[in-house]
Amino acid sequence: MKRVLIITYYWPPNGGAGVYRWLKLSKLLPGHGWQPVIFTPENPELVADDPGLLKDVRSDIEVVKRPITEPFNLYKRFTGRSTKERVQVGFLNEKKQGGWKEDFALWVRSNFFIPDARVWWVRPSVKFLKDYLKQNPVDAIITTGPPHSMHMIGLGLKRALGVKWIADFRDPWTDIDFYAQLKLTGRADAKHKRLEGEVLREADLVLCVSWHWADDLKKLGAKRVEVITNGYDPDDLPTPPEPVDEGYSLVHIGSLSPSRNAPELWKALKKLCDEDPAFAARFKLRFVGPVDHTIAENVAEAGLGAHLERTGRITHKEAMRHMQGARVLLLLVNDTPNLMGILPGKLFEYVSTGRPVLGVGPVEGDVSRVLDQAPHAVIDRPGLMEQRERIKAMFTAPPSEPDPRWSRAATCRQVVEALDKL
């Protein structure tokens, strides 16, 4: 059996959106003749503690862990945060933050930790893996980012050993939605772009999760790019199935950063409640996961405070129950320059439940390629008020069958084809 080294920052019991792609694929790869070896930090900053994910780690997979030094505790102490507080991505703050300390810490983090706060792990990892791979050779390496420091490890190994290397971009690097907020100096911006270009040009293959982003990566210099979307694992669906809510629940799963806010939607929903008291009596807006304070405030300002339910951060297993029990699932595409290619991993889990999915974002974007059939709908922000009756009809729409194109089994076959062609 061939061997592939997968270098990933996220691995169980660490939860969050970054862990699922290669956790699920590594479970399936041995069935196609590829034995994964996982290289991951021993002591990472936890996004979410979710030990339930360990059930997806195959007992026959070797997991190599090495210590990592990160600056997050210094950052937390300097800004007055608790050392137990999770560091959010995408400028999400559940409570109001402010002051010069926050601004200065962001400036330091953005300009001195390039490409990201895991940069101190690059050199020791390259040194360790060069020795490890001489004793335990592999046929290919896959690095997955963000954090893009994982790609810098792959670049170092490629240059030192000439091993076949796939760089997997779950999110863009310099085209990430919050890049403009990083307060970069010209020198730091140039360094980001130089390192990104080196990775894109020197990797044997670049993978990404959406079609628009593939085009963007080609423009940035990638010599060979393939799209392998995220997917769903039918084994994650609750057993027995979660009953569908009696009320009209509109449920968003996952983090809600400021760029995902949709004031037009909150106003359209309030209008529906005002126009139809029977609908209002049954309507609930449920946020499952961390929510930026500006969004919660915006929902209340729109007059939907009495309809809002929040659960906070929960495990993946609990999140799947909320998905399956929702009347309608809500996907909010970030209102940012790279919005056309945003295709979140949770979208495919949404589809697996058979529940209607309301996508709020560009109709011409990649989300529409997945939500291309009823009972799903994609509506851009300016059109939400005008199409509010269409939204209301979704709460009584029949369920659908999940499309097998988006299963993890299908995406794993694509990964195997890519590995075999290296």
PLM ranges: what are they?
Residues 243-260, 266-269, 411:
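Conserved donor-binding/catalytic core segment of Leloir-type glycosyltransferases
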Residues 282-289, 294-320:
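Nucleotide-activated donor-binding/catalytic signature segment of Leloir-type glycosyltransferases, i.e.
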Residues 381-389, 395-421:
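A charged, aromatic-enriched C-terminal amphipathic alpha-helix characteristic of glycosyltransferases
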Residues 1-72, 205, 225:
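N-terminal subdomain of nucleotide-sugar transferases
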Residues 212, 231:
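Carbohydrate-associated surface elements
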Residues 204, 307-309, 323-340, 395:
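Acidic donor-binding loop of glycosyltransferase active sites
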Residues 40-119, 123:
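A conserved catalytic-core segment of Leloir-type glycosyltransferases
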Residues 130, 149-152, 156-160, 173-174, ...:
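Membrane-proximal helix-turn-helix segments that form the acceptor-binding/catalytic region
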